[in-house]
């Protein structure tokens, strides 16, 4: 899988839920698109009947009401339909590691479905590829890439928009001569463990032109390979 070329097929998806904790909250919608050769070619969307009522606050955020999911497939049926659509492709989501994948895993566990996906998180990709943005929300990246605006907080719209974003990212990766899934890690990421360590502010003074050149290299490395909320330099 790691050797998969980036001109292959990916399943780009998004989820809506009843809350933030996958241990006690449930899926309400799964939206997805298939990206093939850098283009969105198929779409999928399903509401999910959750195991608890949707609160007014969540309805205000997502636009999904209890009436909309009343006759929707249950969690197991919806997840199985999504996995058939994904058909073993590498999954792609924004903030996948912290949110979407956790919810899918929780749903799979409750449903007795084996689910150990290979996935790409476009949040960490964007941090490495587009340093200096004021935040890395999907909408911010969409605007940075000058793509059409969309209705956020609905899985069908968010997944289609992320599919377009991912296509641009693939094109940008090709320009960096990153051509495989593994290359995303080796070519962009540096050591992610470095990013979790405590950091200190540093002032660097240079004595001459050579020092200035080396400083530029350090700054570049900090932004491209070790950017996490702030540019960092490992000791």
Which ranges hold each PLM region?
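Conserved non-catalytic scaffold segment of RNase H-like nuclease domains
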Residues: 1-117, 131-153
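Phosphodiester-processing cores and adjacent nucleic acid-binding clamps
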Residues: 11, 92, 97, 102-235
């Amino acid at each position: 899988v790691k050797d998969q070329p980036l001109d292959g097929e990916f399943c780009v998806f998004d989820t809506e839920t009843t809350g933030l904790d996958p241990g006690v909250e449930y899926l309400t919608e799964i939206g997805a698109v298939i990206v093939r050769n850098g283009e969105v070619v198929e779409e999928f969307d399903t509401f999910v009947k959750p195991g608890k009522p949707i609160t007014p606050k969540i309805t205000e955020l997502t636009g999904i009401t209890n009436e909309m999911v009343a006759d929707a497939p249950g969690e197991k049926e919806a997840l199985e339909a999504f996995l058939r659509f994904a058909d073993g492709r590498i999954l792609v989501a924004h903030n996948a590691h912290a949110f979407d994948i956790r919810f899918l895993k929780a749903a799979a566990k409750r449903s007795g479905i084996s689910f150990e996906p290979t996935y790409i998180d476009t949040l960490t990709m964007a941090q490495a590829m587009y340093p200096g943005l004021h935040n890395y929300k999907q909408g911010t990246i969409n605007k940075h890439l000058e793509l059409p605006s969309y209705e956020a907080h609905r899985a069908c719209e968010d997944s289609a928009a992320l599919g377009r974003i991912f296509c641009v990212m693939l094109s940008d990766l090709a320009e960096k001569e990153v051509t495989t899934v593994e290359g995303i890690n080796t070519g962009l990421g540096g050591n992610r463990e470095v990013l979790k360590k405590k950091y200190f502010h540093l002032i660097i003074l240079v004595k001459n032109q050579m020092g200035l050149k080396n400083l530029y290299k350090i700054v570049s490395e900090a932004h491209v390979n070790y950017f996490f909320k702030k540019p960092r330099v490992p000791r």
